[in-house]
């Protein structure tokens, strides 16, 4: 496990006494490297496991280093840590599943209400769109590369990506994007501007990019202007 490997490294690098961490001045290059590695590994441990009891954490280091006053043998320690992280993983998975379910329901409710509004058209896939401005050029195909401006938001208005805000259009292949975009772009002519309301199953579904504003099963809204069919 990641946590256990980090602890193993720490046990080799960190020197503690029973009153806390020993304070030593940095005198040599090796001192600096040792201290820097200790800082880096400690940050990684905190990022992986931030709710530990600091005193017992240090006590565990100290006991393992000098092999005295051991409260848990190695097998028991591994069993405890493994069980704890399995439980945390299950709790996190359950939380993500609940959030994904709530996002799905919120998106479906939004789209059900949105489809009844003036100007909203719905395709067989569930993609909804409004024509903000019709174009006069050609329509792209799945073989096309296009240049577009876009502004993407969640259904609550949160902006997650925008070439408009960046002030620079972007280019990509029609099939190199989410399914809702691939379908929607082929409805447009060069020069057109549409607003797309995209169900989660033709957006990023249950597996959006990690760490982003788009969460699992989120419905998305895009203002898209098709500037040019590049090829």
Locations of regions flagged by a protein language model:
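Cross-family detector of peptidyl-prolyl cis-trans isomerase
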Residues: 3, 16-231
